[in-house]
Amino acid sequence: MKVYVNGEILDEDKAVISVFDRGFLYGDGIFETVRSYGGVVFCLKDHLDRLYSSMKSLKIRQSLSNKEMEKAVYELLRINNLEDASIRITISRGISKQRVFNISQNEVANVVISAQSFIPRPIEFYEKGINADITHFKRNSQSLLSRFKALNYLESIIVRNEAIPKGSFETIFLNEFGYVCEGTVSNIFMVKGNKLMTPSLDCGVLPGITRKIVLELASYAALGTQEGKFKEEELKDSEEVFLTNSLIELIPVVKIDDRRIGNGRVGHLTQKIHSLYKELVKKEIKN
């Protein structure tokens, strides 16, 4: 497999960065994960807009323009002969031998892009739904990092691995005020009546690209939307619950902890929204 590193496409065993890279040493960087369908990267512009906005906010010096990044992504797909792929764009602040808190304006970002064949989740996840659990660890709604896809995923890794022995696919965070926040790698949605609800960004939620799309699609399913603050019991009392991210699209949740969601089956509105999402993907590929 070939990997893009700072303007070069290299064999993966030759794709290296410095031991003084700030992303490696301090988690000083950000990333985006995108998915391609038939060789077309879905919502790449949205992901790159978020990436470059984050770089600007975090004062990470750009080494590629938005258009150059897009070109690099497609070139990597072409060279690796990939059509349905998961792609990760990783940006670190660059190389620095200075102290951790000293950010030099001369540092240029390291850019690494990797791609591999997309491995879909088991079909039964979508047909029968998955289990999730709620961790006792809390997300900080006031954290600077809640707005960014930062490299440091240690918190999510720890709580996700605690969930595996329980048979849970995903772990859900509440924030410090006890409001539903997000999953370790997903945004969360609830359906009650004809309303689609999701935690508001001020709960400490990552502004997910798929989250944004689902909110836009809701009207086509005759659903109203509400972004707000919801307690754990409100989540568990929902008629339907589903998770979103760019790789899984939408996955229904039928049990949280030991509590069945709705009738314990995949909800028809979840299926409707997922169908609309798939239609949008097909439309973008066709265009």
Tell me what each language-model feature is.
Residues 1-172, 176-179, 216-287:
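Conserved alpha/beta cores of soluble small-molecule-handling proteins
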Residues 179-201, 207:
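Glycine- and Gly-Pro-enriched alpha-helical subdomains that act as flexible
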